[in-house]
Amino acid sequence: MPELANKLKPVDSEKITINLGFVDLGHIDLLIAEGFYSNRSDFIRTAIRNQLERHGDAVRQSVARRELDLGLRHFSRADLEAVQRRGETLHIQVLGLATIAADVTPDLARATIASLHILGALQATPAIKAALRDRMH
């Protein structure tokens, strides 16, 4: 088995698909043609950032209330082994990207991760995702 198969590729974004009406799409294309945006992705990213900024206070309050880790949170094998030695379990709550190292075994993940609530994306091997499926909210 190639070594690359054992490693997770770092990602900095997640691809999404949306359905738009033809008139809305035409308006976007017109703004691109007029030079307001470089392409459709630029328009959509800008629109999303503007909406997130518009609701920024509510988002910040919700993040604090829910006690979410914001941004990137990585869980290495050493991290989880330390949790296991202490006889503890983790309740992982992340707004952003949570990653679990490729060398973490499904048994170690199940022994140390009691629950996962990810608002954003989880990057882990398919075996880890399958092992934790019943703990994801």
Kindly give the residue locations of the regions a language model identified.
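Short, positively charged interaction helices/loops
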Residues: 53-86
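Short, T/G/N/S-enriched strand-turn elements that build extracellular solenoid repeat scaffolds
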Residues: 63, 79-91, 102-114, 130-136
